[in-house]
A protein has these predicted regions:
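Catalytic-domain carbohydrate-binding cleft regions of carbohydrate-active enzymes
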Residues: 1-248
Length: 248
């Protein structure tokens, strides 16, 4: 049966057009919502990156941080990318990008005992070919991105200037969904790609925090129950990319 992997996330620019305190408050609110959701619904998986947001939670709500650590151990909360922030990857120097990776990786190694192997550039407006070499030498096997925003999506092998290669996934349409429109995203994807064996659809309220909504989750569950052509799996990007690699 054809598979659609559903990646719930909540993109959040912590200091874009607002003060640090506001970004911090939104990050903690988003993490509270996601934590409650993971604990309530079996089979649901939440994904988030950016170690600075986890640091804020650890410093201000240690009990919430411990709950997240438990969810990570259970596989219900997945750490994406593992960077300090989700930065632009065209204008900054290679050294800057490496430091983003190193600082984030050290935090997740210390507090969660893991380092992700899939990097993301959901909101970066461009992706330098030189990034491939940096990712590979920093230990990443995979990369997922969105922009430029168009109907072209799917997996490919990206080769860097030095011959380094990385499994890469171009996402469909957008990384988040407005409240109540997750099923609309899935329907659009199925219409555009009815014959693909392995598929990825991202959802969750975001662009400035939010996370999963109960309406969307229940709508997705109902849609999945009535859709006989696809198996729907709440997952993270590494599971999707591994399935795509096996397929190709």
């Amino acid at each position: 049966m054809k598979k659609i992997f559903l990646v719930c996330n909540a993109h959040l620019d912590p200091v874009w057009l607002w003060q640090r305190a506001e970004g911090m408050a939104e990050a903690m609110a988003t993490f509270r919502i996601a934590t409650d959701f993971c604990e309530k619904y079996n089979g649901f998986v939440f994904n988030h990156n950016e170690s600075v947001l986890y640091e804020w939670v650890m410093e201000n709500e240690p009990e919430l941080f411990e709950r997240i650590k438990c969810l990570v151990k259970q596989g219900k909360w997945r750490i994406m990318s593992g960077w300090y922030l989700q930065p632009d990857v065209v204008m900054p120097s290679g050294e800057s990008i490496i430091r983003q990776i190193r600082v984030g990786n050290e935090f997740f190694r210390e507090h969660f005992g893991e380092i992700p192997k899939t990097a993301i550039g959901f909101d970066a407006f461009g992706h330098s070919r030189g990034l491939v070499q940096i990712l590979k030498k920093c230990g990443y096997d995979n990369y997922a991105y969105l922009r430029p925003r168009d109907k072209v999506c799917g997996p490919f092998i990206w080769e860097g200037f030095d011959g380094s290669k990385i499994n890469t996934l171009k996402l469909y349409e957008w990384y988040n969904t407005p409240k109540g429109e997750a099923v609309k995203r899935i329907e659009s994807y199925v219409k555009d790609f009815p014959d693909r064996e392995v598929n990825c659809v991202t959802w969750g309220i975001g662009n400035h925090g939010g996370g999963p909504s109960e309406k969307d989750f229940l709508d997705i569950t109902e849609f999945a129950d009535n859709c006989k052509d696809f198996e729907f799996i709440h997952a993270d990007l590494i599971h999707i990319l591994m399935n795509l690699i096996k397929l190709n």
